[in-house]
Amino acid sequence: MPSGNLYFFYELLIVKMNILYLTFYFEPDLSAGSFRNSPLAKELSKQGGENCHIDVVTTQPNRYSSFKVEAKEREDVGNMSIHRVDLPSHKSGMMDQVRSFRKYFTEALKITKGKHYDLVFASSSRLFTAYLGYVIARRKRIPLYLDIRDIFVDTMNNVMKNKFIKSLLIPFLKLIEKRTFNYATHINLISAGFKPYFSKFKSPSYTYFTNGIDDIFIGNNLQPIRDNDGVFTITYAGNIGEGQGLHKIIPQAAAGLGSGYQFKVIGDGGAKSMLVAELERLGVSNVELLHPVSRNELLEQYNNSDFLFLHLNDYEAFEKVLPSKIFELATFNKPVVAGVGGYANRFIYENVDNVILFQPCDVDSMVAKMKNYEYKNVERQEFIRKFSRDNINQDMARSILSYL
């Protein structure tokens, strides 16, 4: 190591590498995107060290209008700078999401204008964060590393009901998708179920780093003994959207299971009104709806439950996905009740013990399996070891840094 006056010239020779990190959700927000990207950015910062700077461009917490938490607009932590774009208030409707992303898109371009970067990393579930990454990377003529958490074109093709709008929107989305994915240097697919869909994009190299288990769930798994009051509690926590299809399963299952089972639904989202309407239509009284809670409060809710619930709607697009929620629920020794199809169904069957598994929206199958189930608790230590978020993030950060 040079010493004295030569040290100044030595520092000039060191080239600091700059990474632009794009993610719509980041801590302290409550969402799968936030839980994935917050620890990954920290691991990237750690491995990059003093010769690497990371610019995170994200949003103020906005996942749920019913959950408010303060966060700094600009935050500097070591070699990482976090820029949070303030978004208009919304209720999670389609047009609300369009307006929110338009604001994020334009502000991100302003924040990054004139700055030098060596790599753009973009974590995207709705395609447009990936597209934002493409726009910036192409303008600056630098590599683009994408982390793809959903196949947005597939999802919109399934969810959108208006045929005229769909006929205009889907070709437009496919054009954006083609440009974005063909430009990318590398694409990480969060689910191996996406692999066949992406086989048409030949330019990038691929990895398959999944979601993982956060330490908060491993270290605070208290596992209290049931009080044996005769009523089983089934808890769902997360988004209440069209994608989860809770309005197609929980009211009907609650009616079929009867008073011996109590559902707790913790969360918010665009399809909550449909869930409420269906509960009222069926006159169901054994379902409790609660607002979103912090992760520490969620731990308490999980620990006081008997079953932990996961469900996706019966759309073809969802046969390729692997919901992040399974990594959260399987850390507890409680039985998991999962209504999923396709790749997620196979993944859970092969990796998660003590699970009540059924096809999406199949009320009769769920009710029958619940009634025939002999209650037990099972530790899933091998699953926890295999899918630790820390281990996955270390490998993924190394992969990202290899493109500098």
Range-by-range predicted roles:
Residues 106-110, 128-131, 135-139, 152-153, ...:
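Membrane-proximal helix-turn-helix segments that form the acceptor-binding/catalytic region
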Residues 360-365, 371-404:
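A charged, aromatic-enriched C-terminal amphipathic alpha-helix characteristic of glycosyltransferases
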Residues 244, 294-301, 308-330, 337-349:
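Nucleotide-sugar-dependent
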Residues 20, 227-244, 249-253, 264:
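Conserved donor-binding/catalytic core segment of Leloir-type glycosyltransferases
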Residues 69-70, 200, 212-231, 245:
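Acidic anion/phosphate-binding donor-loop and adjacent secondary structure
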Residues 273-299:
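Nucleotide-activated donor-binding/catalytic signature segment of Leloir-type glycosyltransferases, i.e.
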Residues 60, 193, 212:
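Carbohydrate-associated surface elements
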Residues 7-81, 186, 251, 256-257:
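N-terminal subdomain of nucleotide-sugar transferases
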